[in-house]
Every structure is written in C-alpha cells, then in structure tokens.
Amino acid sequence: MKQLMIGNAAVARGLYEAGCGVASSYPGTPSTEITEEAAKYDEIYCEWAPNEKVALEVAFGAAVAGKRSFCGMKHVGLNVAADPLFTISYTGINAGMIIGVADDAGMHSSQNEQDSRHYAIAAKVPMLEPSDSAEALAFTKIAYEISEKYDTPVFMKMCTRVAHSQSLVETSERVEPALKEYKKDIAKYVMMPANAKRRHPIVEQRTRDLIAYAETTPLNRVEMGDTKIGIITSSTSYQYVKEVFGDNASVLKLGLINPLPEKLILDFAQKVDKLFIIEELDDIIESHCKKLGLDVTGKDVFPLEDEFSQNLVAEKMGIPVEESLTLDENIPVRPPVMCAGCPHRGMFYTLSKNKCTVMGDIGCYTLGAVAPLSAIDVTACMGASISSIHGFNKARGEESEGKTVAVIGDSTFMHSGMTGLANIAYNMSNSTVIILDNSITGMTGHQQNPTTGYNIKGDPAGKINLEALCKAMGFNRVRVVDPYDLEACDKAVKEELAAAEPSVIISRRPCALLKYVEVKPPLNVDKDKCKGCKCA
C-alpha cells in the first residue's frame, strides 16, 4: 500500500517491517520522530533512554540477546555514544542492529554542523544514507540484512530535509524473524586487550568485504545522461542535482556512503568528461575520489557549511536561476523567545537582576541568553553548565564565588549533568547549580524522561526524585522554589550564593504548554492605571 510519510516515519515503518524488537533512543531534532513513530507499533518495545550512550548500549544488549534492535540520536548525540560505538564495531553483533543518526546541515536546531560520516569511517561501521522517504524505508530493511551478514552495527544517516520531508512509500507487512540463539563467546564479546587484538583483523577484513559489496549493491546506482558532466552525490543533494539537471548530466548516486566503492567510481569517471562531487558539509566523497587519483571539482566550488538547495547547485554549476519573489525586507525580525508563561522566565529574571554570571546548557532555557533577559554567559553542550561552573570558580576563586551559577534542565541533568554534580561534591567546589525542572523534555517536543514518572507511551514509570538524588550526592543545601514566585527566587539565589558550600536550587513548575497544566485567564495591562514604570 502506498502512503505519504516523512522520512523519520518511513524509517520507523522500516523497523516495523524488518522485525525490529527493541528501540532505545534519546530525543534530538531532527531524529526524534523515528522513535516516536516506532512506539506506535506494539511489536516494537520502545523507550527514551537518559542519554545516547545508554541508548546505544541498550540496543547492543538486545542485539547480542538475539533480537533486532535500533537506537536513535541526532548528530551531536553520537559524540556521547562514541565510547561504546568503537568497541561494538570490534565485537560485532548477533541479531541486526541499526544506529540511526540525523545530521543538521544549516543548524536549524543544533549547536554545530558536524558531519556524522566521520564516525562511520573512524569506527569502521557501514553507513547508509537515503535521499527520500521511500529509500528511508527500504534502506532500513537492507541495513538489517547487512548487519547480520557482516556481523556489524549499521548506521542509518538521515538529515533534516529527508527526516522531515514527505514522499510516497510502499508499505508491506511485518516479517517476524526468529529470536537468534545466544551463545556465550568471551573471545568475541569481552574486549580485554588480548581479545581485542584478535578482533581487529576481523574488522579490517569486514571492511574489505563491504567495499566489494559496495561495488555491486543497488544502494549505489549509475544514472547515465549527458556525459559532458558527471556528478557523484548522495542524500538530498541528489534530489537537487536531478531537479537542476534532469538528464543533462550523468549521476552516480551513492546510498552506501561507508565504505565507498572504488571500481564503480573509477568506471563512472571514465565515462564522463568532467567530474563534480556535490555533497553537503565535509569533503568525504571528494577526498575518497582524490585518493583514487581522480581530478574532481568539489569543495573548491561548493561550500563546506550550511545546507544546499536547488538554487545553490544551479548557481555553483553556472546555470541561470529564475528570479523568484523576494520578501519585503521591512518585515520585523521575530527572533525565538520563551513561550508565554514559561516558568524559566522567572528564574532568569532573578539571575539577570542579581547580575549573576550564568553557565548555561542545552534546552528551551538556552533562550535565556536572548534579550531582554540576556542572562546566560556560556553554553557549550549538554551537561557542560555544571562542569563549567566548577572550572570557572576554581580558576577565579573568591572573585567569582557568590556570583556565578549553573542552570540545567531536568532532562539534561539526567542526560549528562549528574557526573558534573558529583564532581562538585567530590572536589568541594563552592558552586550553586539551578535545576530548571519543567517536568518534561521540552525543546524536542515534550518527551518523557526519568524525572517525569511516565514512559514513551505515557504509561506510569519509575520517577527519579531530584532532591533525594542531590542529597545522596553529598549536597546539604538543596531547596525547591516556584519560579512564578519572584520573591522566593530572589531570596533563594541570594542565600545560596552567600553560602560557603555547594548548593542546588530546583526551580520547579511544569512547562506552560503541557496538556495537564491549569491555564489561568491571561492578564492585561490597564492603560489608565499604568504608571509606565516598566515593571513588565
């Protein structure tokens, strides 16, 4: 049956049809919907893990146990999962295992533009990259076949445009694979040095076998047209190329982007007069072609940053672009702001009022850096606020103590904040950490987390008590405030900054957009009574 699906939903459908049994992920745009959609299939056990490392390890455990598995994350989440990734490449798997990773060229919702293909190369793990929803579904099923045939986890690399664009897919029924037998195999699965040394040559042979597979797999296909121009491309760039050129260029479309074929590329290059490489972000395909001794045009014309478009491809290839309607440049700029009623506003107002130096983190509350609050000084990655305040205070000593705080959301705290908090307790840092507990993972679309008491399906689940956790870590000063109570917030911040020991303030009020939050009638300014004191 044909259906219209976004790419992420198509991957989820592929998981279902291929008989995936376990999916563990951490939400992160643009990857989130894969697991949300997979959770709609009762045959797949789905969960939100505290972070991407845990998710990958859960999927690995399920694969070793004999059940096809999946873990999903955005590109920066792969940094968190890198530790087990490199070792699992050595151990291999039992049942098939897919690692879904979504890159964000253009940084629509990310702090950097890293290219996940580097991880596939470094970890020596095969990577598939679809260019539309139909391929997303089909490639997912093929990925399990590759995983089990070559004893390896397999990357399914998405990007924002493929993940969130709709196209037609052909669905089929689920094929339920038998649970594979688990056999204890210390030499294969226990990566102490002696065993790892024996596994490394196996990994290298696997790569050679996969290169041979890349030469003939239908994942990579040649579309011959005009031979004056030859283009090697992948993912959404393929769609742009076809829209610009049609049959006026010959195209080698790569779906298996690690490892890359050699003979296939060399044969294609011989059939065209001039060879171009069109790929978003880094020059992975281009570098491979140059290693093969080919004269190619790539990043000397196409940018290393931002996402591509049809117009960009046409412009860089010297093809006239039809003029389109231009926006009225006088339209007011509308930068992102916190939602009306956002509980984080009260705490950031307090911190700004007290002229605190604020180490920020990743979440909706990163918008606390935006005017008029302008409260956050530094934001790097998830969990960095707590570790950074420790380093900041150790570096500046009494000069910064009593003036610097860290802010982190409840989900981010569970993701990677606990180790930083343990470091503060262990190394006796006089630092104040504010956990902004809005009872949900807000920025990625209201996903549950270990502090909410509900699982991915909305059913009751275990709930972490933040106050008890902080006290168990050795913090004597732990207090809870309502960020709507500005006086209480101001009092708490002043008292904890003045204390001569580390402390935690939990700023707790549910996200204003949660369905179960009681919404009071909106307030209006009485212009006749307003004194113009700018209190609002």
Regions found by a protein language model. Name each.
Residues 1-8, 12, 18, 130-338, ...:
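Flexible, low-complexity linker and terminal segments
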Residues 104-153, 159, 194, 336, ...:
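Conserved thiamine diphosphate
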Residues 1-133, 161, 224-225, 248, 369-504, 517, ...:
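Thiamine diphosphate
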Residues 37-43, 242-252, 468-474:
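Short helix-loop-beta junction
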Residues 43-50, 91-102, 184-185, 426-439, ...:
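A glycine-rich helix N-cap at a beta->alpha junction
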Residues 34-37, 60, 81-85, 107-114, ...:
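Short acidic, glycine/serine/threonine-rich loops at helix termini
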